[in-house]
């Protein structure tokens, strides 16, 4: 919890980070692995890094502009994300898996003035056609690309942030490249409301962050940790999850069902002590989770929670502490959130609700009505106020990794082949499949 901080009075993220720096000056706020060595970062060092990178942004005449961020989940990516917020600019985190064509489309859609990237993304970033300033997080040999590593060695710039709660600071894209991307607008106010108040309703000391930053969970969880005085353990890639659990020893982790299943395979065979883990709380979200996984977790004495949210609400919405009596329910509205039903569709409302979709008034007016976000999910509620998902209003497939896939888009691409007459794309046992009727030669 963020005791002593009245988050409702915070105007912007410079105010927020300045307060957090003073509170956590000599506290470990971030941990990550460098090879097999655990690196621990104190608050004074983390926020000094944020100040330095924010100075580079201002000296490059980018303050207040839309700045893209692309790369692997890392300490450097977190510092740059926070630096963009600190200056009152707009952070637009994009997937590192985009093609050059897709990246150009998003650069144009989000009206980016600059793109900050880790060095592994340099090749694709150099293919951006628009007049965008490029900043490499590390060193670069490209003459017209700024090096954040070199520029931050220069004197700091005195930063003034005059933005207010209603000013935009983040554009997030819904779903992956396989669904129609909508650019979600978050303001100082919605991002503060989505991270400072209690999220999980349980006590914990450190949380593991592995999600890509272009997923809302990827950048919200670190801000939750920083704002609530927890240690943020940063992992890069789900494939190394067991190393992170063993060496960084977080006591809280948020997972999608596919990862929870992997965790449960270990927990069925070993105790946490044998594994070297320290988990007290597991939160599962992103897609419907098989109830038998909950039972495995709870048998090990770990608190199990199921969460339901969206990019539009910064992941907040409905949450449930799983017990033997409510395995099928997604729970009740979380702290500060409200839920309702309209013609069977689940609606959400709360202070972390986004300000709409960027440059898309038609979709905004369809999705947000009288302050309520229409999720597109169908649900039921019982007499105790517990919600249960029953289906999708829109025909989307939600994979076990949380990604939304539009079957119609896949069908439209495959049907172009002259050998195919009809196609039906569907989900079965966690995989996407298709029923195809060939166009036989006459």
Feature map (PLM): residue ranges:
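Gly/Ser/Thr-rich phosphate-binding loop
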Residues: 251-255, 263-326, 338, 421
């Amino acid at each position: 919890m963020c005791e002593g901080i009245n988050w409702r009075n915070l105007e912007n993220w410079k105010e927020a980070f300045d307060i957090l720096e003073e509170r956590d000056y000599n506290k470990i706020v971030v941990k990550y692995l460098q090879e097999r060595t655990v690196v621990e970062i104190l608050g004074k060092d983390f926020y000094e890094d944020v100040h330095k990178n924010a100075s580079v942004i201002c000296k490059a005449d980018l303050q207040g502009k839309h700045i893209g961020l692309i790369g692997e989940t890392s300490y450097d990516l977190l510092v740059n994300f926070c630096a963009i917020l600190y200056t009152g600019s707009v952070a637009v985190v994009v997937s590192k898996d985009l093609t050059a064509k897709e990246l150009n489309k998003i650069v144009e859609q989000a009206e980016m003035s600059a793109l900050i990237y880790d060095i592994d993304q340099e090749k694709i970033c150099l293919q951006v056609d628009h007049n965008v300033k490029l900043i490499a997080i590390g060193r670069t040999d490209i003459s017209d690309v700024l090096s954040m590593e070199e520029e931050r060695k220069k004197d700091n710039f005195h930063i003034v942030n005059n933005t207010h709660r209603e000013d935009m600071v983040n554009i997030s894209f819904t779903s992956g490249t396989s669904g129609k991307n909508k650019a979600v607008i978050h303001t100082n106010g919605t991002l503060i409301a989505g991270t400072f108040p209690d999220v999980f309703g349980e006590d914990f000391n450190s949380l593991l962050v592995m999600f890509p930053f272009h997923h809302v969970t990827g950048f919200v969880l670190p801000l939750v940790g920083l704002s609530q005085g927890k240690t943020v353990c940063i992992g890069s890639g789900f494939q190394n999850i067991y190393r992170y659990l063993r060496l960084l020893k977080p006591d809280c982790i948020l997972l999608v069902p596919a990862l929870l299943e992997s965790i449960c395979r270990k927990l069925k065979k070993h105790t946490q002590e044998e594994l070297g883990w320290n988990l007290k709380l597991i939160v599962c979200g992103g897609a419907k989770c098989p109830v038998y996984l909950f039972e495995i977790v709870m048998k090990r004495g770990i608190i199990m929670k199921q969460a339901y949210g969206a990019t539009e609400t910064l992941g907040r919405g409905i949450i449930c502490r799983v017990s033997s009596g409510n395995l099928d329910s997604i729970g009740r509205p979380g702290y500060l959130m409200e839920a309702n039903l309209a013609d069977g569709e689940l609606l959400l409302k709360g202070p972390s609700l986004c300000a709409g979709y960027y440059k898309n008034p038609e979709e905004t007016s369809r999705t947000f009505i009288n302050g309520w976000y229409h999720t597109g999910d169908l649900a039921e509620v019982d007499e105790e106020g517990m919600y249960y998902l029953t289906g999708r209003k829109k025909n989307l497939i939600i994979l076990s990794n949380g990604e939304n896939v539009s079957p119609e888009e896949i069908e439209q691409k495959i049907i172009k082949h002259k050998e195919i007459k009809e196609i039906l794309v569907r989900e079965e046992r966690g995989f996407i499949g298709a029923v195809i009727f060939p166009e036989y030669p006459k």
